[in-house]
Amino acid sequence: MEVRMTPLARSRPRWRNQLSLQGGGPAQATLVIAMMLAGCAVGPNFKRPNAPTIAYPTPPSAIGPQSVVYGGDVAGDWYRLFQSQSLNALVQEALRANPDLEGARHNLLAAQYELQAVAGSALPQLEVGAKASRAKINGSFLYQPPDALQRTGNQFSLGPSLAYDLDVFGRIRRSIESQAAQTDQVGHQALNVYVTLINEVVLTAFDFAASAEEIAATRALVADLQAQYDLTQTLENAGKTTRSDTLQAKAQLENTRAGLPNLQKQHDIYRNTLLRLTGKAPDDNSLPPLALHDFALPVQLPLSLPSQLVRQRPDVLEAEDTLHLASAQVGVAQAARFPSFNISAQYAQQSGGTGDLFTKAAQVWSIGLNVAQPVFEGGRLRAREQEARQRYLQAEAQYRGTVIDAFIEVADAMQALQHDTDSYNAHNTALDAARANRDLARVQFERGLVSELVVLTAQQQYQNGVLTQVQSDAQRFADAANLFHALGGGWWNVQADAGGEPAILEPVKRNAALSLPGAPYDQP
């Protein structure tokens, strides 16, 4: 199994040889001018990693009553497949009121505004300034003897100034690309909050319902054990059983009773977790009723194609954004080693008095081109470039690891579904046998064939089976939910009117706020 990546170019910047000053001439000058007009950007152009050549373990065509649709898509409202109105209401309330989701939305909006701010650096910067000063000058300033002319006077100036970085080698554009990748990263983090929130609400709802039924089953079991203990004690007093049997019944009763407080504690934790997920305080009593028998298993289970999975999971997309950001930073570091070209222009009305400030004679202007080339910086710029390359390689390795983790999570979910279904079927068979044994014991007791103790023992075995079956049933629901989450959560299929938040669900458009031709991306 191998995850392949598009490698980062490790050759010298391609423009370095072309800009060599050795043997200069008209051809070289033409090349420099052409580069300035074209606005070339040094550094690697990012390309999305190819879909990995990873396969799932051979999926079954069906898991119990559920069919597996290989290549099937995940519904945006997959939680509705469990057919519970109470669950649907909880998810919608969480999407509306969860503070973490609201915080993620504002964080995304802030990142988008930051991208717009950074993008502004690619455009000419125009300012209007005004200045008023009073100074004393001497003749030496005017190339005259110091005492030839001494004057104290006012100076007034008003006018615009323009500065523009031509960005010949793409330092600014790579910086904007880096910021755009970072904005995408924030957007996919927000998507991760969204899909994780839905999954947590669904799983906690299952746990909340299951814990209530576990409490009920345990209380019924305690009642049966209490009756069994009372009967054993009566038999001991009549000399029909031993003291050891009575103590054993007592220990079993109290051990089972001791589990009730812990079950109630877990039930309260699940309740408080649901309140937190839906943005409510612990004293709120508005949770809808939830019971396991109100849920239904989804009839079909989708299994996305491997090539689709890496385009669906927010964590993989976030890792891709990190890789893109690192790629752009390599370009920023490379561009810092090349010359910078800046145009500056100024126009002003300057005068020693306000009366003639706006006359034609008071007009002044200047325009110029500034060129700066780093010559000696102690190896700092080269080290920064090597650092950026290592950051890229680190991001590349992290991306591969994230992709592998994604496939493992899907495989784990599928295997859990299969194993827990097998376990459920076995528990169900055992429960049917325990129910039949209990019913038979009751009939035999009514006919005087067995003692009451036999009936109570059969009833106890049945209640133990009910308790185990509740846990097994809840686990199957959780396995299905975990599969939907592992496949990406279906956020790409959510409609705006389905209760989702458009600011979270809409993918961040790369350079959406920009109008830069020749964007330095190579993306499908």
Predicted segments with their positions:
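N-terminal secretory signal peptides that target proteins for export/translocation
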Residues: 1-22
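Structural signature of outer-membrane beta-barrel domains
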Residues: 133-137, 277, 348-352
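Periplasmic alpha-helical coiled-coil/stalk elements that build and connect Gram-negative outer-membrane
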Residues: 172, 188-305, 416, 420, ...
